[in-house]
Amino acid sequence: MPLLDSFTVDHTRMNAPAVRVAKTMQTPKGDTITVFDLRFCRPNMDILSERGIHTLEHLYAGFMRNHLNSERVEIIDISPMGCRTGFYMSLIGTPSEQDVAAGWTAAMEDVLNVESQDQIPELNEYQCGTYSMHSLEEAKDIAKTILAEGINVNKNDELALPESMLKELDVK
């Protein structure tokens, strides 16, 4: 099985909260697609609560679009990581890590301004696969933590696992 890009970086050295350009690729028409690793907490040290990350998934996607989408950037998708330490954001365009961090900060402030659970978008059995698994309070706790700690930048060249280690770790 091919080694995915996200597994070529050393998760023990990742800072969080932090933005990282996980991948860039060109479409046949010449558009650039950028995938960002939006790391909310340190891998293997902390984990986002189930209800909190689910509520953030519903809120964060819209708020990030409000702050990042422009004539040069269009968010395709924002999805939680299976390890529950952050989100992946795929978009058309090449915003800087600082622009993404500023949008993320503004989105966390927006989360804190949501007044009640009934303001969570698509919170119903028709549009959500587990609509009873939400907590606005837990989402706000996550947002408060991000705002208190500030958002840094993780660089791939600083996190790259050496080839020798990748070979050693190779699953047979």
UniProtKB/Swiss-Prot annotation:
One of its GO terms (biological process) is quorum sensing. It comes from the Bacteria. The lineage of its organism: Bacteria, Pseudomonadati, Pseudomonadota, Gammaproteobacteria, Vibrionales. InterPro entries: LuxS_sf (IPR037005), Metalloenz_LuxS/M16 (IPR011249), S-ribosylhomocysteinase (IPR003815). Fe cation binds at residues 54, 58, 128. It catalyses: S-(5-deoxy-D-ribos-5-yl)-L-homocysteine = (S)-4,5-dihydroxypentane-2,3-dione + L-homocysteine. GO terms for molecular function: iron ion binding; S-ribosylhomocysteine lyase activity. Homodimer. Its EC number is 4.4.1.21. Involved in the synthesis of autoinducer 2 (AI-2) which is secreted by bacteria and is used to communicate both the cell density and the metabolic potential of the environment. The regulation of gene expression in response to changes in cell density is called quorum sensing. Catalyzes the transformation of S-ribosylhomocysteine (RHC) to homocysteine (HC) and 4,5-dihydroxy-2,3-pentadione (DPD). Binds 1 Fe cation per subunit. Its cofactor is Fe cation. This is S-ribosylhomocysteine lyase. Belongs to the LuxS family. Pfam families: LuxS. Keywords: Autoinducer synthesis, Iron, Lyase, Metal-binding, Quorum sensing. It comes from Photobacterium profundum (strain SS9). It is an enzyme of class 4 (lyase). The keyword NAD does not apply.
